[in-house]
Amino acid sequence: MGRTYFVEEAVGRYLSDLSVKFKPYVTGLLIGQCSPQRDYIIRAARTPPKEEQKEGNTSPSKLDSIDEEWFTAHASQISRMLPGGLLVLSVFIIATPELSKDCQNTLRKLIFSIEKSLTKRRLWKPADEDVSDRAALQICSATKKIVCRTYDVQDPKGSAKPADWKYQSALSASWLSLGCTVNVNIHIPLLATSPNHDLEKNTKNGLNRWSKQIEDSIFLINGQVKDNDIELLEGQKKLRGNTHSGTQIFDVKVLTQLSQGSSHRSTATVQVCSGSINLKGAVKCRAYVHNNKPKVKEAVLALKRDIINTLSDRCEILFEDLILNEGRCKKNFERVYHVLPQRLFVPFAGSNVMLSDYKFGDEAAGEIQERFVEMLDQFVQAEDIHIAEEVNTVGICSLSEKMDDTQLEQLTKATLLLKLQQNMGVVIAVAVAVFASIFSFNYFSD
């Protein structure tokens, strides 16, 4: 028996409009949530036209002219704009009858291309209960006939399976929301033995280690540790103060493991470092889960992935911005601070789920509005843009002269990293009030 996709009625109206406006075909992405029992589609977005296509509402006449790289880049951009629990779940083609016989092969190719691209960027590990089926939706623009099939992205040689496509009103109008603030303080050493420092690669390696801590953390939901296999709403009373527009909100605290047990011993290692990357700040995280008796483990998993994704995505955006505006970072600063982009949330009609995006301090609301139109084909009112985090001013200090041998020796001693036995029994916590997520590069010249 194939999977069943429950689809927001507004998605059906959007697809119907596209079938009238664009000929001979139009492609796009479908956004939703997987669960063991059923899947949900709550949003659709057509592929943005390339520059040469913006003059008119026409597409190339053949499906083999679809730019796979452009399509995949769109999926990567959209994945950054999704809170925890949501993912790019499906691809669609609306085409004339003349092109129908080639649609499924094209959809299959696009599904696996997207999965390959998104998997490269992920820092979290797939769970055993993750659903690996992705839908390929084909609609005939003349007859409106719908063909929905699924492909298992873990099985490239597998064949398509039929799936049901059912529209439902107010599908995500009362989904459950989980939110938390995570304080981040990540130190990533840059080894002196490395001939040159690939900052992006080193940052990703550091985030990989940090993501394992998040995955091993304990999550308190409304102040309680809940068993993974119970329903999220079990024992939960719906209070007036805990709802907003039909949304039940859960406040989550993340308890990160600071030390391992005495059975986990490690030998001391010394690393001589010529610099470091430090990530410090507080990040706002949010996840949504369906209201069809979700389990605690579904909700916690969605929030864990949002925590990991939001920090990883911000670092990617920052590096892209540095390369675009400044060229590759040069190793000529003693200490350089960069502010990571802030997170923001925007609503969309008919749902209590909010979409996400990121902005640098100098970005105007108009730029954010343009991005939502281009990426999600959605107009956003400026007053509906909710900035989740505040920003502090940071400075840049440059190295004016080379250090002598004595200074270098002192500096080297100061940057020795000792991985000592982890059951020391004493933990010193230093609280730092940081409102923004601040990204600092520390460079030490030799």
From Swiss-Prot:
Pfam family, one: ODR4-like
Keyword 4Fe-4S assigned: no
PANTHER family: PROTEIN ODR-4 HOMOLOG
Main location: membrane
Function in brief: May play a role in the trafficking of a subset of G-protein coupled receptors.
Ion transport keyword on record: no
Domain of life: Eukaryota
Family listed: Belongs to the ODR-4 family.
Identification of the protein by name: Protein odr-4 homolog
Native source species: Gallus gallus
Location in the cell: Membrane
Residues that span the membrane, as ranges: 81-101, 424-444
Swiss-Prot/TrEMBL GO biological process terms: protein localization
Signal peptide (UniProt feature, chain positions): none
Membrane topology recorded in Swiss-Prot or TrEMBL: Multi-pass membrane protein
GO CC list: membrane
Entry keywords, A to Z: Membrane, Transmembrane, Transmembrane helix
